[in-house]
Amino acid sequence: MNTVSVVQFLAVGCAVFVLYGRGVFAAEGVKKAGQHKDAELCLGSDGLGHRLDEFWYNDDMCQRFLCFKDDEGIMYEQIANCPIAIAEGDCTLKPGRRATTQTVRPAVESPP
């Protein structure tokens, strides 16, 4: 079987639909970051402190997180999921690799 990234799907001839948000992740939402003992760190969903503009990942859920500060100085945690992909015809969809590879993409497998 051929395995290709969705960026290469035209070469395989399978119909693939991919919904992308910012970059390779589909933005899911933003929430106010919790208060960490160090005021310059975001308290992430993972319970750890993260520096401003730092990315961290949950590979099991294929999620990427970002700590940022708005114009008023309030820290937020941005949560983004991997893109959604649909394969049609004889093609099958393989889940994306780990979220820590910033080029996460689902893959499409086509029959030989």
From Swiss-Prot:
It is found in: Secreted. Contains 2 disulfide bonds. Keywords: Disulfide bond, Secreted, Signal, Toxin. GO terms for cellular component: extracellular region. GO terms for molecular function: toxin activity. Its main location: secreted. The keyword Transmembrane does not apply. The keyword Protein biosynthesis does not apply. Residues 1-26 form the signal peptide. Expressed by the venom gland. Belongs to the scoloptoxin-16 family. This is U-scoloptoxin(16)-Er5a.
